[in-house]
Amino acid sequence: MRTEARGGERRRGAGRPRRLGGSMIAAALVAVVLVHGTARAAEEGATPHEPSKFGADWQSWHANTNVTDMPSVQRGARNFVSYCLGCHGLKYQRWSRLGTDLTIPADLLQKELLPPGDKLTNYIHTSMPAKDAETWFGKTPPDLTLMARARGPNYLYQYLKTFYVDPSRQTGVDNLRFPSTARPDVLSELSGMKRAVFRDVMAKGEGGQSVHQQVFDHFETLAPGRLSDSEYDGFVRDTVNFLDYVSEPAQAARRALGVWVVLFLLVFTWLAWLVKREYWKDVH
């Protein structure tokens, strides 16, 4: 009886390596799906909104960045140099790295993007002195190298799309994403001038009392810009896409390498399971 009991325990234990191996393979498959899905989601983003329909849903607008879209990143670099570099720098990024990653020849980079007197080996700095900037704007414009990682591409996209005329502000404009911003709307020649229309709503304040609140409703165009709504939307997406790349230049390579690493682990797990099964076959 004791021998039979032990034999039964061995038979029950013999199935454990198989179940364990199956679980390991299943876990590896799930990991592959998650990594692939995350990379795709990061590249594709959410469904874009219709740029001509400005409304109260601005907080759900998505940049839909894709740093592997090289033409978009290249256009974004051009946009940044033309409209942003005068105030904002990229102090952790070199011109040479920019040219290499964006496949821009050195002579073309020197001709089209580099400021006069700058070198390819230099970091990308703004020419505006920090003290002068603080005097003019009340604070020094931030460096944008890591802004996309700190705030997220969607934040930058919404910020650049929600400027509106406000005569009470020193710069003449304000922003929905960043109220009381010190930044002037340097892109108004492209986007045009818009007025924000707010509506009164009743809300509960302190002590449960009803209070009036101003809630954004929609934009009204006061003066058209050089670009149509869809063209300006593409301009902003390219610019944000470039800043997303700058925040982590190796992210495209990292995602591609990550898939191969997970596949390697999957194959290694399967081989390890085969060895384990062969080993336990002799034991049982």
Q: What name fits each language-model region?
A:
Residues 37-41:
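Sec/Tat signal peptide C-region and signal peptidase I cleavage site
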Residues 224-258:
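Short, aromatic-rich amphipathic segments at membrane interfaces
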Residues 80-91, 239:
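The canonical Cys-X-X-Cys-His
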Residues 257, 268-284:
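Juxtamembrane interface at the cytosolic side of transmembrane helices
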Residues 103-207, 216-232:
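Electron-transfer interface patches adjacent to heme c in soluble/periplasmic c-type cytochromes
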Residues 43-46, 50-78, 89-100, 247-255:
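Electrostatic cytochrome c docking/interface patches
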Residues 4-26:
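Bacterial N-terminal signal peptides that target proteins for export
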Residues 26-34:
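Bacterial N-terminal signal peptides
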